Amino acid sequence: MEPSKLFIMSDNATFAPGPVVNAAGKKTFRTCFRILVLSVQAVTLILVIVTLGELIRMINDQGLSNQLSSITDKIRESAAMIASAVGVMNQVIHGVTVSLPLQIEGNQNQLLSTLATICTNRNQVSNCSTNIPLVNDLRFINGINKFIIEDYATHDFSIGHPLNMPSFIPTATSPNGCTRIPSFSLGKTHWCYTHNVINANCKDHTSSNQYVSMGILVQTASGYPMFKTLKIQYLSDGLNRKSCSIATVPDGCAMYCYVSTQLETDDYAGSSPPTQKLTLLFYNDTIKERTISPSGLEGNWATLVPGVGSGIYFENKLIFPAYGGVLPNSTLGVKSAREFFRPVNPYNPCSGPPQELDQRALRSYFPSYFSSRRVQSAFLVCAWNQILVTNCELVVPSNNQTLMGAEGRVLLINNRLLYYQRSTSWWPYELLYEISFTFTNSGQSSVNMSWIPIYSFTRPGLGKCSGENICPTVCVSGVYLDPWPLTPYSHQSGINRNFYFTGALLNSSTTRVNPTLYVSALNNLKVLAPYGTQGLFASYTTTTCFQDTGDASVYCVYIMELASNIVGEFQILPVLARLTIT
């Protein structure tokens, strides 16, 4: 074997040759140098990449900044355009909702004033039907059908002594005569009034005539208003009109009645509703009367009765209150079979299981006194521009929003619609609703009812239906006592307590006695002013308020059925009083 070239053996010792040691050091140096070079290159590459990234970011930021600047400029331009448009829209809204109505109202008042002057002065040749125009005194025009108070603040009230004025309501003229069921409507230009004149005591199913009048508000020398009668119609044609409702319409009055010569209970027991009459009485002595058959009447109703309280002329439509008995197997009867409304007085609630109270509330709509028909409220709606050629429509509210049907009144105040419903069923408090209609050219119109919670006083009622009852039960009791709202009702919390209204109540829980003028809030009576002697018998009352814009005085006319010991069972009396508000 050839000896190793790396080692030389001498005396058993091994020695590493010098040339071999130098080669190893060079190899280590080269390795370190290569690592260093690679590291420097790597660091350089990283720095280049970072630098390029930063440059790219700066370039992008500059572009984005330019884009944002452009977008910001466009937003500012749009904001300026929107602000300009909003300003124009605000001007339009203010003009339409404030300026234009005031201007129209001013023009209307000026026109009415001019018309009154022309009609009064042109005695030789006149286009007017008489020398006295059918136009209220200008002092009252702007104060009719307006809320007297609109600030929702707390107020105090006082009712002045009844003012001495000529009565615009005639009384019976014989001991066995009877005048009953007053209906009164005050419009911007004139007023309309009607009542039933019953020939044999107060049995209205036998034979009766209908008294209708129209007139204007004028100012007396004493400074307070007077109801001046300009036209009278006495409908004595053999038709036994009953439960008539009146409404002021352009140039006259509209009256809705039904004709029947049988007992009310017999009407409910039948299957075909009695004749419905719509009568138009104009200032030029023209009378137009039609028998109407409103859509939805036949096949659904056993009977339909006008609501007694006045109706309204609104958006070129006549709207009257109505109620009656629904046939159980009819379309309307089936649709409403499970509907009921059970209000609760939170200050004096009825105790008992809610499910049981609900069942009792449902049963209250079907009194056996009326052959267990569902007693339902409704509204008769007629298009004014086709009043002589087309039929009217029955608009029926949901019984989930109203109590058992009863007499009522439709009010139009500040262009807001309200509905008074007599508390004929178990609920003893005043019933007042805000209502809104949805009219359709084809198909069924609808109405939404929003109950206003009033707990300040109760009406008289018999037996288990007295004014002290607060629990659902079957009742046919109570009495018609409509209120006049002095303020708008607001659904905002905290201010509803300042909703005020006035009227004439009967101050007893069981008997129709003690007529009393009042002003009330939702939960408490503010003022009580008894009328007549203690124990005086009375019945229906209807109230209308208005303002003299000349001196800001507020007047209310309380029309009351009062017992008479001289002529007839009742005498209908209009009591005019001044209402002071502080």
Curated annotation (Swiss-Prot):
Reaction(s) catalysed (UniProt annotation): Hydrolysis of alpha-(2->3)-, alpha-(2->6)-, alpha-(2->8)- glycosidic linkages of terminal sialic acid residues in oligosaccharides, glycoproteins, glycolipids, colominic acid and synthetic substrates
EC number per UniProt: 3.2.1.18
Pfam families for the chain: HN (PF00423)
Keywords: Disulfide bond, Glycoprotein, Hemagglutinin, Host cell membrane, Host membrane, Host-virus interaction, Hydrolase, Membrane, Signal-anchor, Transmembrane, Transmembrane helix, Viral attachment to host cell, Viral envelope protein, Virion, Virus entry into host cell
Gene Ontology biological process terms in this record: symbiont entry into host cell; virion attachment to host cell
GO molecular function, one term: exo-alpha-sialidase activity
Keyword Membrane belongs to the record: yes
Record's GO cellular component terms: host cell plasma membrane; membrane; viral envelope; virion membrane
Location within or outside the cell: Virion membrane; Host cell membrane
Residues marked Binding to the glycan motifs of the host receptor (site): R180, K242, E264, Y323, Y369, E407, R422, R512, Y540
Family as reported in the entry's similarity comment: Belongs to the paramyxoviruses hemagglutinin-neuraminidase family.
Entry note about domains: The C-terminus (head domain) is involved in binding the cellular receptor.
Quaternary assembly: Homodimer. Further forms homotetramer (dimer of dimers). Interacts with F protein trimer.
The protein's role, per its UniProt record: Attaches the virus to alpha-2,3-linked sialic acid-containing cell receptors and thereby initiating infection. Binding of HN protein to the receptor induces a conformational change that allows the F protein to trigger virion/cell membranes fusion. Binds to the glycan motifs sialyl Lewis (SLe) and GM2 ganglioside (GM2-glycan). Neuraminidase activity ensures the efficient spread of the virus by dissociating the mature virions from the neuraminic acid containing glycoproteins.
The name this protein goes by in its record: Hemagglutinin-neuraminidase
Organism: Mumps virus genotype A (strain Jeryl-Lynn) (MuV)
Lineage, top ranks: Viruses, Riboviria, Orthornavirae, Negarnaviricota, Haploviricotina
Gene: HN
